[in-house]
Design a protein with these regions (language model features):
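ATPase nucleotide-binding head domains, primarily ABC-like/P-loop NTPase cores
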Residues: 121, 127-331
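Alpha-helical coupling/stalk and coiled-coil linker elements that connect catalytic or binding modules
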Residues: 1-176, 183-213, 235-236
Length: 331
């Protein structure tokens, strides 16, 4: 009469068996470690219930699931169930364990995830001893970086740039294709995200005011959602405008309104930048549209920078260095 329910429980239990066996070992590592950091001690304390350890509780369930799995043995499956209702006994033990520890299990998984994340972050710092931990400031400077580079570019190939952007300033970056605009935007974005989670950044010196990041860099169309590329862009830009009404964000925009004609793109980009300035936004926009740089003549908050391209020995040459002003050589 209970065979269908027992089989359903066994199906789920069998999937979870190896997970609990592995997580029992992870919890044991956390419990047996000696930490000096207060936050790590606090997280370690969360995996204890009175005199019981979370690892022991997970091990207990793991053993129950192992025993339940023996129902596939012909002798145990037939004789033990015939005389001792073994499957029902193990189902009762599993459900009893769930009723007892259900509310705690979720928080224990979160503790494991926390230590896993911290371990990954610590490994990154260990592997990059030359990177710099950011200095948190609380004044007019939003971000100040010396020799800022992209952490995923090899050191021997990496070209760094220095930048100072104050609160409520907006940078317009122009440059030829392949000159380094998008890489620079990703570099700044990564530096902010890495700083926000406590990682060192690829720079010799880095000061910033902690701030959330919001971007529009790789918008795509969607056949399944019946959205054109242009409509997806508009949705993303509207999302950004709505977001900055309530909170401060550092905004990164890469070549917006690519889904429309050049005339509408120029007009729309100019109005959008002015809208962001009206909201006292801080950020960077990269563009091929040199006319957008004229906004700096109307608004003091807007600054122009560029990445240059030159013809050297009849070949296109990029130095990937950020310079003040408007790009003169476009490809």
């Amino acid at each position: 009469i209970y065979i269908k329910k027992i089989n359903t429980l066994y199906l789920y239990a069998n999937k979870a068996k190896e997970t609990f066996k592995q997580y029992h070992q992870l919890l044991a590592f956390i419990e047996n470690e000696t930490f000096t950091s207060e936050i790590l001690k606090q997280k370690q304390a969360e995996i204890k219930i009175e005199n019981q350890k979370a690892s022991e509780i997970f091990l207990q369930l793991s053993k129950i699931l192992d025993a339940f799995d023996q129902r596939n043995n012909m002798i145990i499956g037939v004789f033990a169930n015939s005389f001792a209702l073994r499957d029902l006994h193990h189902c009762h033990r599993i459900e009893q364990w769930i009723d007892t520890y259900l509310e705690k299990v979720h928080s224990w998984f979160e503790v494991i995830a926390f230590f896993d994340a911290q371990n990954s972050l610590a490994n990154f710092q260990f592997n990059h001893p030359n990177f710099t931990f950011p200095t948190i400031v609380d004044h007019t400077t939003s971000l100040k970086a010396e020799n800022l580079g992209h952490p995923l570019i090899a050191q021997e190939k990496r070209i760094t740039s220095s930048i100072i952007i104050n609160n409520e300033e907006f940078f317009i970056i122009t440059g030829a294709n392949m000159a380094g605009k998008s890489t620079f935007l990703r570099t700044v974005s990564l530096a902010i995200v890495m700083s926000n989670i406590g990682l060192p950044v690829c720079a010799t010196d880095f000061e910033y005011t902690p701030i959330k990041l919001i971007t529009s860099m790789r918008t795509s169309d969607s056949l399944s959602d019946d959205e054109s590329y242009f409509f997806s862009e508009l949705k993303r830009l509207k999302y950004i405008v709505d977001a900055i009404k309530d909170q401060k964000y550092f905004i990164i925009l890469d070549e917006i309104l690519k889904g429309t004609n050049s005339t509408d793109k120029a007009k729309g980009s100019r109005k959008f930048v002015k809208k962001l300035v009206d909201f006292h936004a801080t950020g960077i926009i990269a563009t091929h549209d040199l006319s957008l740089c004229e906004v700096s003549e109307e608004l003091s908050q807007v600054q122009n920078y560029y990445f240059d391209a030159e013809i050297v020995n009849e070949e296109l040459y990029f130095d990937y260095s950020l310079k003040t002003g408007v790009c003169k050589n476009m490809n």
